[in-house]
Amino acid sequence: MDVDVFNGWGRPRFEDESLMPPGFRFHPTDEELITYYLLKKVLDSNFSCAAISQVDLNKSEPWELPEKAKMGEKEWYFFTLRDRKYPTGLRTNRATEAGYWKATGKDREIKSSKTKSLLGMKKTLVFYKGRAPKGEKSCWVMHEYRLDGKFSYHYISSSAKDEWVLCKVCLKSGVVSRETNLISSSSSSAVTGEFSSAGSAIAPIINTFATEHVSCFSNNSAAHTDASFHTFLPAPPPSLPPRQPRHVGDGVAFGQFLDLGSSGQIDFDAAAAAFFPNLPSLPPTVLPPPPSFAMYGGGSPAVSVWPFTL
């Protein structure tokens, strides 16, 4: 690798510029495009480099340019000759078969970072499909670089041709076409409507689920066998009446329930009814049958008084 010194500017130059080193990326600044590349092309029309192709932009559509570029993923660089509309005029022909390039905004000055002197100008153009003035704006953007100021052609050489320009073409990111917007809006509306209808259908189910229940004591439980799942909510627990405090000996003598003469057993049913008068009784189907066991060595079944099993 040697160093090519040109007009006070030094840059490394590979002996075989067609073979780029691994990881090489071509991202020059505006000043570098003017001083390292366009100026050399203007002085020597045979000048070429590994990163910039030479094309006729009037015979190429913007979507064809990435394939004609030597390198680049989002930006592509080209040398091209200006096509004058008239031999003696200054207006440039920027039309292709499918459309035309239209300038937008003001030209931007490119100055030296060291001396602040003017080196060139940058023009921004947008590609329109169709013919003016009814062309359809596209996402393709081109920045056209030309020499100016201290690098003006009459300062360089009388034999230099000012038709050479350097162009950077890119596809503007984040731009969505009209068709894509329509599809996206219709899709989002359909999805929103679907969720809205689903939500309205689920709402009564949730309301029913929250309000309906079947009592465990209902005689119509068989009628709800095929009902939806929300009918199987458990009923709230029954509220027990407040118990009245009683003391042994207050109006009821516990001994009166002893019947030792006949069977030698205690009448627990009568005792429970006397001591717990407000205790609710439940149907026998609610509680499992009480276990049987012998009391005092006898064979009689145990007496069950809810909630006690003896």
From Swiss-Prot:
Compartmental location: Nucleus
Any GO CC annotation of this UniProt entry: nucleus
Domain NAC: 20-172
Induction per the UniProt record: By BRM, at the chromatin level, and conferring a very specific spatial expression pattern. Directly induced by ESR2 in response to cytokinins. Precise spatial regulation by post-transcriptional repression directed by the microRNA miR164.
Tissue: Expressed in inflorescence stems, rosette leaves, aerial parts of seedlings, flowers, floral buds and roots.
N-terminal signal peptide: none
Entry-linked SUPFAM superfamilies: NAC domain
Effect of residue 99 to S: In cuc1-12; cup-shaped cotyledon and abnormal SAM
DNA-binding region (UniProt annotation): 119-178
A molecular function GO annotation: DNA-binding transcription factor activity
Outcome after substituting residue 306 to A: Loss of transactivation activity
Effect of residue 65 to F: In cuc1-4; cup-shaped cotyledon and abnormal SAM
Keywords tagged on the record: Developmental protein, DNA-binding, Nucleus, Transcription, Transcription regulation
GO terms (BP aspect): flower development; formation of plant organ boundary; lateral root development; meristem initiation; negative regulation of cell division; primary shoot apical meristem specification; secondary shoot formation
Effect of residue 23 to E: In cuc1-8; cup-shaped cotyledon and abnormal SAM
Domain notes: The NAC domain includes a DNA-binding domain and a dimerization domain, and confers the specificity of the transactivated target genes.
Protein's job: Transcription activator of STM and KNAT6. Involved in molecular mechanisms regulating shoot apical meristem (SAM) formation during embryogenesis and organ separation. Required for the fusion of septa of gynoecia along the length of the ovaries. Activates the shoot formation in callus in a STM-dependent manner. Seems to act as an inhibitor of cell division.
PANTHER family the UniProt entry points to: PROTEIN CUP-SHAPED COTYLEDON 1 (PTHR31744:SF83), PROTEIN CUP-SHAPED COTYLEDON 2-RELATED (PTHR31744)
Further information: Overexpressing transgenic plants exhibit adventitious shoot apical meristems.
Name of the protein in its database record: Protein CUP-SHAPED COTYLEDON 1
Gene assigned in the entry: NAC054
